[in-house]
Amino acid sequence: VPKRRAQAEVMGRPGVSTGRSNAGESPVLKALSQVAADERVRAAEAAVREACGELRWNEALRRRWREARAEAAIRGAIASGGVEGAVVSAEVLREHVAAGSLTEAATGDPGLDAVAGLWRAGSRLVGWMPDLVGRGRPVVPPARSLLAMLHRDVAGPLAAGGRVGLEEVGVPRTGRIRVREGGPGAAPQEEELAARLEGLLELIEAERAPALVRAAIVHAEMLSARPFTAGNAAVGRLLVRHLLVRDGVEPTGTAVSDLYPGRVPGAYAEAAGAYASGTMEGVAAWVVWQAEAVLAGVQEAQRLCRAVQAGTWRAG
């Protein structure tokens, strides 16, 4: 991939086909494979797979994996909300979840509403996860519906609070509709926007894609292409969790990879900017950053599992 075309070839910018080549190989998969072959990316993926393999056999997940997944959804919502500026304690969210008081998009507390939306989206992901012990394997909706459903959960509270229009919830941008949030670089419009969205949908559904690279690029495209007017970064982080579970990299569904962006926001922005540069160097740097976020999420999952096993996870 020529240096300045790395991102374009992955995501189908104007002039770059996302269809099948004469040999039957998808250009998207070819570009992803080239990113995955980078030495730093290979090392990062190996580290992620090793850490996730160790997590898979945590003793707490033998019988209490459902509780662990539910707690991960709470911790993920708290962490992701913090990235978006909504600061709510895990204890407060747990209390509302236990009381069943989060059925409405607006409670009068904008911070709680935002985090509750993220929790609803995370809980939806849990419902799509295969059983960790057993044979249950729920049907996951196609990519376009998947994006719309997650965005409705995330952006519903924004609409209820008057921050976005109802017509923007779950509906991707088209034409020259502008975004309401910042991100790395200028958000695409018109033909480029349509091409980036189609490339994103293809990437989510592509078979045999390198898993870590796929999850990282999907996240980065949500940040840089910004297919919705608002809530793109939060949906991107949710998609990382979904894809790593679906593709078998992190089958437990307990890694809280949302923690890392909140702990080191400067590194998050810098890595996203590197991706948006469009160079192979920048794309690889972003994938390595995503691997670091997953590793931090696995560490949190190990702590979560210890707390679940000890019966103390509701205390923090």
PLM features: what roles do these ranges have?
Residues 1-316:
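FIC/Doc superfamily catalytic core
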